[in-house]
Regions:
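P-loop NTPase switch module centered on the Walker A-proximal segment
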Residues: 3-110, 116, 159, 165
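Feature targets compositionally biased, intrinsically disordered low-complexity regions
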Residues: 1-2, 17, 173, 177
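Conserved C-terminal guanine-recognition region of P-loop GTPase G domains, centered on the G4
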Residues: 100-166
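Conserved nucleotide-binding/hydrolysis micro-motifs of P-loop NTPases
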Residues: 25, 41, 89-90, 113-116, ...
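Short acidic, glycine/serine/threonine-rich loops at helix termini
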Residues: 31-32, 46, 94-96, 120-121, ...
């Protein structure tokens, strides 16, 4: 492209973070929120409206699911962050495997209602086998019947005491406020 100067980054200033988990847990929505908070988007897209940055394929828009891995790069404090939004359904496991190979570390998204399910276990197992650092995000805390404590207990039962919260949801009157 003419007139556009690309910034050069050293390997030390690049982070490749895969976003993994079971289908429908909010991986694409989380990716969209990261892009919005980084200042790349003027508004948040919605999966159900077909307006997210990473679900751009017509089939993804029609089915309201991720089918392909999608790269969402942005800069944060002089570091290039490449978010790799991976599909959550097993029909697209090859894409998940490719995303894991590209990622240096992983965000594993777990629903606050469903808790850890098969996609959670698969992602954790892939991270363990490949030696990748991982962080679990308990997502969808604003949903009815969300239960952070229950999900944390289930995560500890499945994956051991090394799963510890670094941020706690603040609830008031049954509503998420922080």
């Amino acid at each position: 492209l003419r007139g556009i100067e690309m910034k050069n980054y050293t390997a030390a200033n690049i982070r490749n973070i895969g976003v993994f988990g079971h289908g429908g847990e909010g991986k694409t929505t989380l990716t969209e929120a990261m892009l919005f908070n980084a200042g790349l988007l003027e508004r948040l897209g919605k999966v159900e409206n077909g307006t997210t940055t990473t679900d751009y394929d017509p089939e993804e828009v029609k089915r309201t699911i991720s089918i392909n891995c999608a790269l969402a790069p942005y800069e944060w404090k002089d570091v290039k962050v490449n978010i790799i939004d991976a599909p959550g359904f097993f029909d697209f496991y090859g894409e998940v495997t490719a995303a894991m190979a590209m990622a240096d570390s992983a965000l594993i998204v777990v629903g606050a209602v469903s808790g850890p399910v098969v996609g959670t276990e698969k992602a954790m197992d892939m991270c363990k086998k490949s030696g990748k650092a991982r962080m679990i995000v308990v997502n969808q805390m604003d949903r009815e019947n969300a239960n952070f404590d229950k999900v944390m207990n289930e995560l500890n039962e499945k994956f051991g005491p090394s799963v510890v919260p670094i941020q706690l949801p603040i609830m008031e009157g049954g509503k998420l406020v922080g």
